[in-house]
Amino acid sequence: GCNVIIDYVSEVSGTEQEKNALLGQATLLRGFYHLKLAMIYCQAYTASGVDPKTALGVPLMLTMDLTDDYPERPSLEALYSQIEQDFLTATSLLEENYTPDNVYRVGSVAAYVLLSRFYLFRGGDEDLDKAIQYAGMAIEKGPMLSRLSMLMGTDKSIYDSDMSSEVVWCYGGYSFKVNTYFPTDAYQSIVP
């Protein structure tokens, strides 16, 4: 998905601004997916006893080309360097070329949030300052806090992107009614 867009965006019709907006969105999502995989399948970057130069990351898929060869696993350092590069490139492209019209598209505010989370997760001393910087940029440019008393009437509460101004980006989807616990007093009669 993301690599197809990145590899072929120059060949599609549209203005340079539209192409750069697509490139920014695809690059941000590629970095996001690599980060999600790293969070699940890799050792923590700054964990005790972990050397990012020798610890293995997840395979970096940077092109849409498929081969029969198994992809190699780069070092954790190389993986995180590529994720950071994707996020920074995407942030620059999105700041200059695109403002999303709904919460299901990524824009520069989502890029700031993801960069902040990336730096927190990587966790180096210099990374924490960058996490604060990008979180501040997200807060400055992003949505205002919602009044919680206005949201409690919905099943989804603060997660309702139609009601809450705090939602920066939504991806995936599932029913809140199926996955939410609703307390009940139906079993009170069992207790004497």
Task: List the predicted regions and their residue ranges.
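Conserved, well-structured interaction surfaces
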Residues: 1-41, 74, 91-99
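Short coil/linker segments at helix-helix boundaries
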Residues: 40-81, 129
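Structural signature of alpha-solenoid helical repeat junctions
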Residues: 15-22, 29, 56, 79, ...
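Inward-facing hydrophobic residues that define packing positions of alpha-helical scaffold repeats
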Residues: 2, 35, 80, 87, ...
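Hydrophobic-face positions in mid-chain alpha helices that act as interaction patches
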Residues: 57, 105, 132-192
